[in-house]
Amino acid sequence: MLQYQIDRIEHQITDDRSQTGVFLIGPLERGQATTLGNSLRRMLMGNLAGTAVTAVRIAGVNHEYATIPGVREDVLDILLNCKQLTVTSRTDELEIGRLIVSGPAVVKAKDLQFSSQVQVVDGERPIATVSEGHSLELEVHVERGVGYRPVDRHNEDTSAIDLLQIDAVFMPVHRVNFTTDETAVAEGGSARERLRMEVVTDGSMTPDDAIAQAANQLIELFQPLATVTMVEEPGIEPEPSAEAQIPLEELNLSVRAYNCLKRAQVNSVSDLMGFSYEDLLEIKNFGSKSADEVIEALERIGISIPQSRTSV
């Protein structure tokens, strides 16, 4: 199997702390670059776990269409700003961040006080603007998850009137692009390919970590296929061979042998395959000459039966 390597040729961190990594993967056999690119892209975009804001509680507010005295932004704007916060959590439990800010002030993500399990990635992201003589008291709920989770307004656990739910986007990878190109021709004239992949994350994880996690998930997904075992469904009998379906009449046996077998409820080759030579001799009026005749007839169509029951 062709051995390839992965090189990160570019890494950028923008003002909002999002990160971009560009990787070259190769050399690959023809067609493998597209296969690898599609598989990694699907895992990166839809299967990596991330952290997101799932609910917000604002003192004195019980619905998202309200306004807050002394705060420039309305509640919908504040919810949108909170939804765009980039945080990481090292626990699968619900974490809550709180702040109380008096004006005049621009309330930022870094003002939120979380436990040591949570880190705010972009602390300078604004949440609200508070005028002099006013204050803002805010509580933010963050959770870990995968993909996208819409608000469930029928969930009893989230039915508190002052807890404003947010559609949660847990995806830490914002964008994945890839291209393929041909590289040097290998010995024997077969062309090689190279995969160029660009990964953009929200800053809660590096592009390198995102690639590694996606690759490990693909390995876990495909590993069971390496040891496929056949399981017979209960109650389903295998199809009999064509020879087994041959009727007794087509074996051209003597009249004596044919009549004895018919009286013993033997109607086809399939029925005979359940007999041994000793079993044939136990059929009434069925002697060794008739038994030998049956053995020869079966051998002509490529079927043999055992001499005794113990050798079945």
Curated annotation (Swiss-Prot):
One of its GO terms (biological process) is DNA-templated transcription. Residues 236-312 are annotated as: Alpha C-terminal domain (alpha-CTD). Keywords: DNA-directed RNA polymerase, Nucleotidyltransferase, Transcription, Transferase. It catalyses: RNA(n) + a ribonucleoside 5'-triphosphate = RNA(n+1) + diphosphate. It holds the Pfam family RNA_pol_A_bac. Its EC number is 2.7.7.6. Residues 1-229 are annotated as: Alpha N-terminal domain (alpha-NTD). One of its GO terms (cellular component) is DNA-directed RNA polymerase complex. The keyword Signal does not apply. The N-terminal domain is essential for RNAP assembly and basal transcription, whereas the C-terminal domain is involved in interaction with transcriptional regulators and with upstream promoter elements. In cyanobacteria the RNAP catalytic core is composed of 2 alpha, 1 beta, 1 beta', 1 gamma and 1 omega subunit. When a sigma factor is associated with the core the holoenzyme is formed, which can initiate transcription. Belongs to the RNA polymerase alpha chain family. DNA-dependent RNA polymerase catalyzes the transcription of DNA into RNA using the four ribonucleoside triphosphates as substrates. This is DNA-directed RNA polymerase subunit alpha. It comes from Synechococcus sp. (strain CC9311). The lineage of its organism: Bacteria, Bacillati, Cyanobacteriota, Cyanophyceae, Synechococcales.
